[in-house]
């Protein structure tokens, strides 16, 4: 497995508590049973390695992004010709609902976090000609992580992969007294699944734009003269 690290930094960082979850997962015994842990590190940064991979491909490459678009935007800025090598972009981000999932000071709450993290990056990708398959909150809200699913994982924890899955999601338990954490949704799972099985979802074309400034920064909006995305 080849990994390229990113040196991209947020315009609006995720809450510290969320970021700390990465260290918790990294410390899980199941990931540290066999040492030393070795990965093939790319000498390039993430956006540079993306350029390399796209340029070396003999065919168009579909991209799956389940976080902010900063590295893709940086790659497009550095070498705009890579757009010719990209098939589709499957992205978990944005929402056209009245309210998003951002609760941050001096923000009106209409944005989704992956856009809000770097609104300018999303805007840059929107300005490209890349076909965007958007998995927004209105889609992911239909796939909550229910207690029944958690219980089923618990009963099947003898299976190593299921045990790891359950341990990871146990870090984000249902907290019924906190609105933003009352239910966890399978954002990244749905996005990845829709890439591998397109008939899993129904899509429609929406003309849209990204707001980059003001109290609504990071919001995706329907716009008659905006660029089309498959929602």
Residues of each region from the PLM?
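Active-site histidine-anchored catalytic micro-motif
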Residues: 1, 32-140, 147
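Short N-terminal amphipathic alpha-helices
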Residues: 1-5, 208
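Surface-exposed loop and adjacent secondary-structure segments within mature catalytic domains
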Residues: 4-36, 40
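Short, surface-exposed amphipathic charged segments that create phosphate/polyanion-binding patches used
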Residues: 16-24, 103-108, 150-151
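Short hydrophobic/aromatic-rich motifs at helix boundaries and adjacent loops
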Residues: 19-24, 44, 93-94, 161-165
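Short N-terminal secondary-structure initiator segments
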Residues: 30-48, 160-170, 177
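Conformational coupling and interaction surfaces
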Residues: 113-116, 120, 126-128, 132-231
């Amino acid at each position: 497995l080849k990994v390229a690290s990113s040196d991209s930094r947020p315009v609006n960082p995720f809450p510290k508590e969320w970021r700390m979850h990465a260290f918790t997962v990294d410390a899980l015994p199941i990931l540290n049973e066999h040492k030393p842990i070795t990965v093939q590190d790319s000498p390039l940064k993430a956006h540079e390695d993306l350029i390399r991979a796209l340029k070396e491909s003999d065919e168009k490459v579909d991209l799956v992004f389940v976080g902010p678009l900063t590295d893709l935007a940086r790659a497009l800025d550095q070498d705009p010709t890579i757009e010719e090598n990209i098939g589709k972009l499957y992205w978990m981000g944005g929402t056209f609902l009245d309210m998003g999932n951002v609760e941050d000071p001096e923000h009106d709450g209409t944005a989704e976090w992956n856009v809000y993290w770097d609104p300018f990056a999303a805007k840059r990708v929107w300005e490209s000609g890349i076909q965007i398959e958007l998995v927004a909150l209105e889609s992911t809200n239909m796939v909550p992580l229910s207690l029944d699913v958690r219980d089923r994982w618990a009963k099947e924890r003898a299976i190593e992969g299921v045990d790891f899955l359950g341990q990871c999601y146990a870090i984000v338990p249902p907290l019924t007294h906190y609105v933003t954490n009352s239910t966890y949704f399978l954002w990244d799972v749905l996005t990845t699944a829709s890439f591998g099985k397109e008939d899993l979802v129904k899509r429609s074309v929406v003309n849209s734009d990204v707001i980059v400034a003001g109290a609504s920064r990071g919001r995706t909006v329907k716009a008659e003269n905006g660029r089309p995305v498959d929602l």
